[in-house]
Amino acid sequence: AHAAGALLLMDNPWATALLFRPFEHGVDIVIEAATKYIGGHADVMLGTITVSTAEQFQTVKWTANALGNCPGPDDCYLALRGLRTLSVRLERHQRNANVLARWLRERDEVGRVLYPALPDDPGHELWKRDFKGASGLFGVVLNAYPKKAVAKMLDGMELFAMGASWGGYESLMIPTHPGKNRTATKWRGPGPSLRLHAGLEDPDDMIEDLEKGLARLTKAS
């Protein structure tokens, strides 16, 4: 990007600045959904833009002023509240995600687990080189199951709610369709894909919920 005279912008909600330092890797502008891990309680709608130079800050400030972008004081208060516990929550999210990811990859119903903190993940070496940790968000590719079976699995989950905005204290699970979004490479997966967010609940309770869900998946196939 820099060789072509362009600025490099990065979206960094998965790791946050605690687990990945974009400016140390040549990034110029960092955006992040503060709705997710910064807020941490699924009760705020907020985004952040962080820049590396004073000149960029003036440009962003002028643009925000011209567009009338102004977060409410309550939203800012909730984000500041979340920042106080961010490091503690991320540590728990990572620990729970590791437990779930390792458990899921041993299941016969699962074809692949997409989580760079796993030693056998294709991106593990890059993650280990550049990141200081992992968060609670990861993907699961099931083996070949019909949509009705996946729906049956999801409908009966108790701890894992269905929700798009991850990063809060609760665990979430939704179906995903990576094949529809790929442009550079073709998606190859043995079956349906799920996106999981490991919340702050007890991992044993989450595993019990997943085990029952996978049983429904198999029974409905």
Q: Model features per residue range: what roles?
A:
Residues 1-109, 114:
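Conserved PLP-enzyme active-site core in the AAT-like
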Residues 98-158, 164-167, 178-188:
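Conserved small-domain helix->loop->beta segment predominantly found in fold-type I
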Residues 60, 149-153, 206-210:
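Hydrophobic side chains in well-ordered alpha-helices
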Residues 14-16, 119, 170:
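Active-site-proximal loop/turn and secondary-structure-junction residues that shape catalytic pockets
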Residues 67-68, 155-165, 213-221:
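A common structural junction motif
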Residues 79-88, 135-144, 194-199:
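Short, well-ordered beta-strand elements within core beta-sheets of diverse protein domains
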